[in-house]
From Swiss-Prot:
Protein family membership: Belongs to the aldo/keto reductase family. Aldo/keto reductase 2 subfamily.
This protein's encoding gene: ydhF
Positions annotated to bind NADP(+): 158-159, 209-220, 263-264
Record-linked Pfam families: Aldo_ket_red
Entry protein name: Oxidoreductase YdhF
InterPro entries: AKR, AKR_Detox_Biosynth, NADP_OxRdtase_dom, NADP_OxRdtase_dom_sf
Source organism per UniProt: Escherichia coli (strain K12)
GO MF assignments: oxidoreductase activity
């Protein structure tokens, strides 16, 4: 059973692995098939699900909601995360992709997510990306309104720098619950730019997206040395796959990230969560780091 973890001093409690529904529309599941998939990952202990208003051309939330309408009892077994703040050209009114973080948009987006997801509350709402035009007071006002109305229980951000995180936190009477960021052997800037250090300082756990590098890990010739090293470490750890080793590498970070799994195949979800049992040494971790970057530590 997947470990549970309190991700910030004021909560919430999530499963250590998160089921990501970004590519739900690519899985070609019927609502009944999706119910079965949800039940299977809940039974593994993966109870936290990650959404965003824009996923699947603004369709993923509603598709998930149709499944919950067929099995509404599943809602009490899960924690739902969603995001807002990006506007894409998948909607006719948007002639250009842009960010929008004003008060009314955040409230309207959250309320639409509740309708789409067939639920009366979100466990966590994130601002999807930093907005150069973000007024922190407006965002805070929207968050406080949604919190007081009971529509959203916790709030956080995604892809924010430490300064952006601190700015928004300075306007809020409650703690931001997470910063959802890209963490992977093939994407390591956050290990040194202060993002994870800030979260560790605040005892806030990051959510980690694209742990497998969005396919680059498997398809990019540049990362062949990394694949080779992962295979060696997999053998040393008796791991079932190099994917498991990558998840173990992310889990080894002291900021205690929650990896987001993006596969609609339950066998891959099952394999991913087994990474919790792998005990990666410090030297194995640094070997993987070196293989990905191509150079040793200074």
């Amino acid at each position: 059973m997947v470990q549970r973890i309190t991700i910030a001093p004021q909560g919430p409690e999530f499963s250590r692995f998160v089921m990501g529904y970004w590519r739900l529309m690519d899985w070609n599941m019927s609502a009944r098939q999706l119910v079965s998939f949800i039940e299977e990952h809940l039974d593994l202990g993966v109870t936290t699900v990650d959404h965003a208003d824009i996923y699947g051309g603004y369709q993923c939330e509603a598709a998930f909601g149709e499944a919950l309408k067929l099995a509404p009892h599943l809602r009490e077994r899960m924690e739902i995360v969603s995001k807002c703040g990006i506007a894409t050209t998948a909607r006719e009114e948007n002639v250009i992709g842009h960010y929008i973080t004003d008060r009314d948009h955040i409230i309207k987006s959250a309320e639409q997510s509740l309708i789409n997801l067939a639920t009366d509350h979100l466990d966590l709402l994130l601002i999807h990306r930093p907005d150069p035009l973000m007024d922190a007071d407006e965002v805070a006002d929207a968050f406080k309104h949604l919190h007081q109305s009971g529509k959203v229980r916790h709030f956080g951000v995604s892809n924010f720098t430490p300064a952006q995180f601190a700015l928004l936190q300075s306007r809020l009477p409650f703690t931001l619950a997470t910063n959802q960021v890209e963490i992977s052997p093939v994407h390591q800037p956050l290990l040194l730019d202060g993002t994870l250090d800030q979260l560790q300082q605040l005892r806030v756990r990051p959510m980690a997206w694209s742990c497998l590098g969005g396919g680059r890990l498997f398809n990019d010739d540049y990362f062949q040395p990394l694949r080779d090293e992962l295979a060696v470490v997999a053998e040393e750890l008796n791991a079932g796959s190099i994917e498991q080793v990558v998840y173990a590498w992310v889990l080894r970070l002291p900021s205690q990230p929650l990896p987001i799994i993006g596969s609609g195949k339950i066998e891959r979800v099952r394999a991913a969560v087994e990474a919790e049992t792998l005990k990666m040494t410090r030297q194995q971790w640094f070997r993987i780091r070196k293989a990905a970057l191509g150079y040793d530590v200074p």
